[in-house]
Amino acid sequence: MPDLEVRRLGRTEMRPKALGLGGGHLGDPERTDEEAVTAIRGAIDMGINFIDTSPYYGVSEPRVGLALSGGWREKVYLQTKVGSHPRYLRDFSKEATTWSLENSFKQLKTDYVDSVSIHGPRYDIDAPLGACLDVLVDWKAKGRIGHIAIGVRQQEFHRRAIETGEIDIVLTFFDYTLLSQSIAETTIPLALENDVGIILGSPLAASLLAGPEPEFQGAIEDVSNSDGTLTPSAVGGPTDPDAIPYAHRMWEWCEDRGLNIRDLAMQFVLNAPVEGNGIVLTGSANLRQFEEVYASATTDVPEAVWQDFESEFGIRI
């Protein structure tokens, strides 16, 4: 069973483990603070040292702050986001960005965050790379944040952000999984060329590759542009009309051979061509879920399995 290696996250010189903990599910109000704290501290005890959260994720930030109190903060790299607080959703103005940062620091009970990500601009990258980025650059210069990231799926936005010279990390999701490798020849080489760290989110494609049989949900909402192409946020994810059938084929293939699709999914993303300059970010609602993902991330998949998988699906590590 391989251990998780330490990675270099681009020019940030942060040294996180190859797998980080995402806080999206930790903010579920249907779950307790105790569950979230147990999950976070349990992951840290397993060696995880990169935690991502956002004001968009319900009560994730205060729960992360609670979990990292009492000396736990010093054990991890911490990343949160701007542009996604419900009070100022997709408001990338100076005022909204400053308010969001101050609020996040209060919720997280910290005076320093290792990375802050510009979160989810949809149709326009100019505003996020204007006043919002100016605020982050100022806070970085003052030593309140360590690095600046952008979390978005559009590859053109990745390029524009990297070209500013101010973006240290690119976070994307659904874009390098067993179902889609859309950034393999675009964002990944561009980030490596500019020594920008890479975070690959949603390695299990929003649970389509988590182990249980992928469910067909029937009619899927219209996720197409006027020209018939999929919106960027849909490709490779659970609202992509092709994703569930494709995931189901892979799941059946694994079931027929006594394999867990989650093992292949995690090993595939951990072996993305980031040349040691990126990590994988997975979200878990509780410690048991994280332990399952961690087990898959540290499980050897035999070479013969990958050869057969490649023959069927055309991809392998």
Task: Tell me the role of every PLM-derived stretch.
Residues 1-76:
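N-terminal binding-site loop/beta-alpha segment at the start of enzyme catalytic domains
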Residues 9, 21, 36, 51, ...:
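Conserved, mostly hydrophobic/aromatic
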Residues 22-34, 82-98, 125:
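Active-site mouth loops of central-metabolism enzymes
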Residues 24-26, 54-56, 81-85, 118-121, ...:
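Active-site beta-loop-alpha junctions enriched in small/polar residues
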Residues 74, 163-171, 192-198, 274-278:
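Glycine-enriched alpha-helix->loop->beta-strand junction motifs that scaffold or abut catalytic
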Residues 88-176, 182:
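Glycine/proline-rich, positively charged
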Residues 164, 203, 214, 220-300:
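Conserved short secondary-structure transition element at the edge of the structured enzyme core
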Residues 182-223:
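Aromatic-lined glycan-binding groove of carbohydrate-active enzymes
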